[in-house]
């Protein structure tokens, strides 16, 4: 955790180290925004997919354990599991949509 925090602080220090009155071309700024958008989209989607995979694994494990304890509830638990899996997958799809918006319809890029 300390390494990640140090890396983020180092990136922030580089980002804020530019002179305030220095003339900067808008195209150069757009390149940096695009680069950081790709990084943010990749990291965000990766974290969402990791969380979704962990959630799906826990859901399946709990359903299997519940069915093993009470086989009569198997079909009911299976239905509930599929609903839960759909909700978990929806969250990952929402992260994908946000990542695609950040990549292809970025509101921070100034068009000339």
From Swiss-Prot:
Gene3D superfamilies: F1F0 ATP synthase subunit C. The keyword Transmembrane helix applies. It is found in: Cell inner membrane. It holds the Pfam family ATP-synt_C. The record marks 89 as: Reversibly protonated during proton transport. It comes from the Bacteria. It is a multi-pass membrane protein. One of its GO terms (cellular component) is plasma membrane. Its main location: membrane. PROSITE patterns: ATPASE_C. The keyword Amino-acid biosynthesis does not apply. GO terms for molecular function: lipid binding; proton-transporting ATP synthase activity, rotational mechanism. Keywords: ATP synthesis, Cell inner membrane, Cell membrane, CF(0), Hydrogen ion transport, Ion transport, Lipid-binding, Membrane, Transmembrane, Transmembrane helix, Transport. The chain crosses the membrane at residues 36-56, 81-101. Belongs to the ATPase C chain family. F(1)F(0) ATP synthase produces ATP from ADP in the presence of a proton or sodium gradient. F-type ATPases consist of two structural domains, F(1) containing the extramembraneous catalytic core and F(0) containing the membrane proton channel, linked together by a central stalk and a peripheral stalk. During catalysis, ATP synthesis in the catalytic domain of F(1) is coupled via a rotary mechanism of the central stalk subunits to proton translocation. Key component of the F(0) channel; it plays a direct role in translocation across the membrane. A homomeric c-ring of between 10-14 subunits forms the central stalk rotor element with the F(1) delta and epsilon subunits. F-type ATPases have 2 components, F(1) - the catalytic core - and F(0) - the membrane proton channel. F(1) has five subunits: alpha(3), beta(3), gamma(1), delta(1), epsilon(1). F(0) has three main subunits: a(1), b(2) and c(10-14). The alpha and beta chains form an alternating ring which encloses part of the gamma chain. F(1) is attached to F(0) by a central stalk formed by the gamma and epsilon chains, while a peripheral stalk is formed by the delta and b chains. This is ATP synthase subunit c. The gene is atpE.
